[in-house]
């Protein structure tokens, strides 16, 4: 993957750490007719944006992701649980669509090119989510105390009553026959491939950083280690 750091430093709360331990990854799609991560990033790089996430996955170029915020920063992603608990990212959609009536309804202006964009964005998102799950020690199908999966969509947050009333990204993935269950399965498969590729023929050594009676304290230490660039996970 080509992950490019292009931080939105004009955001008024840039650099502010989330107040809760990171326990999940929240997936969005942008909800506008745009396949360029750069265009999405530029729209968010303002003092008081309508929303801002940690990264944007491109739908125009294979493997391209723009990082907008440091991993440990809070986000303005879903007006709810995701802002303080989740690593959040958007997936660009397509230039070949037109939204109607100010909601999630849209029409496709060029079906072939639209499907190419959505499929490319999906593939990029699978690889990126797999990389972040490995980095944060997140299992996509693990369940959180609120009933959500540890890898969940904005729409799933809405259905669980912990996110704002958006239906992304399933409203565009339905056109390519994909669901969040498919996505989690694909991410788990990509995680396995990435682990095998990174560790093929290598012996690995694990270092324990601490032992805690309180899981929240353990999560805080793990998050500090991740922010410093280490791969960290909590295990009982």
Annotate each predicted stretch with a short phrase:
Residues 1-85:
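N-terminal catalytic cores of peptidoglycan-degrading enzymes
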Residues 3-7, 14-19, 95-199:
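Basic/polar, cationic surfaces and motifs that engage anionic cell-wall
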Residues 27, 87-89, 151-153:
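Hydrophobic faces of well-ordered beta-strands that scaffold small-molecule active sites
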Residues 35, 63, 76, 97, ...:
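Residue-level signal for secondary-structure boundary sites
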Residues 60-62, 90-94, 157:
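Glycine-rich, acidic and aromatic/proline-enriched surface loops and short helix-turn segments
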Residues 80-102:
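Short coil-to-beta-strand
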Residues 196-236:
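Solvent-exposed beta-strand motifs enriched in subsets of small alpha/beta binding domains
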């Amino acid at each position: 993957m080509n992950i490019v750091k292009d931080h939105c430093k004009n955001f008024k709360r840039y650099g502010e750490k989330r107040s809760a331990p990171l326990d999940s990854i929240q997936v969005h799609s942008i909800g506008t007719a745009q396949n360029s991560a750069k265009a999405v990033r530029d729209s968010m790089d303002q003092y008081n944006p309508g929303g801002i996430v940690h990264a944007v996955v491109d739908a125009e170029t294979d493997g391209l992701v723009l990082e907008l915020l440091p991993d440990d920063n809070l986000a303005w992603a879903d007006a709810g649980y995701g802002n303080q608990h989740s690593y959040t990212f958007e997936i660009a959609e397509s230039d070949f669509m037109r939204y109607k009536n100010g909601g999630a309804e849209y029409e496709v202006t060029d079906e072939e090119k639209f499907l190419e964009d959505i499929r490319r964005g999906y593939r990029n998102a699978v690889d990126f989510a797999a990389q972040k799950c490995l980095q944060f020690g997140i299992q996509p199908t693990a369940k959180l105390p609120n009933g959500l999966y540890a890898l969940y969509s904005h729409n799933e947050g809405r259905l669980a009553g912990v996110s704002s009333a958006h239906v992304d990204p399933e409203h565009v993935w339905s056109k390519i026959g994909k669901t969040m269950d498919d996505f989690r399965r694909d991410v788990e498969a990509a995680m396995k491939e990435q682990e095998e590729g990174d560790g093929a023929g290598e012996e690995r050594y694990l270092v324990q950083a601490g032992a805690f009676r309180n899981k929240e304290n353990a999560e805080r230490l793990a998050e500090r280690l991740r922010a410093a660039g280490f791969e960290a996970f909590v295990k009982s």
